[in-house]
Amino acid sequence: MTRKHIEVVAAIIQKGNAILATQRGYGDLKDGWEFPGGKVEPGEAHDEALIREIKEELQADINVGERLITVNYNGYEKFDLTMHCYMCTLTEDSHVTLLEHEAAKWLTKESLYSVDWLPADIEAVDALYKHL
């Protein structure tokens, strides 16, 4: 039997020297911390998917920058994951409103590992730590 494969994009939203982490409020991975984002729809470019997902989840508008890392993670029980992580910033007048997450924190480089990141996000956190 072929395992389900999901392709997602994640926004590493930077504001000053802080990065946004969000805590999932739903599903099997509830309560884990992640970079916000979601599934890429068929025919959708990564930047389009990021802009759409962040608007849906956080009611925020973002500028999508460089791709930091693509993570291939096969450790979840029900699916394999490819996650494309992009450096992003909020647009000038935008702010974050939690619609799907339980909580959010702005983390500095020093506090990046202070939350319980979901397993698939850890490789991206490690890459981000080196990047900052």
Residue map of PLM features:
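Conserved N-terminal beta-strand and adjoining loop/helix that marks the start
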Residues: 1-19, 39
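Short secondary-structure boundary/capping segments
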Residues: 3, 11, 25, 32, ...
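The catalytic Nudix box helix
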Residues: 35-68, 108
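Residues at secondary-structure transition points
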Residues: 40-45, 49, 77, 99-102, ...
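Nudix hydrolase/Nudix homology domain
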Residues: 28-33, 98-132
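Active-site-adjacent beta-strand/loop module that shapes the phosphate/pyrophosphate-binding cleft
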Residues: 61, 71-95, 105, 109
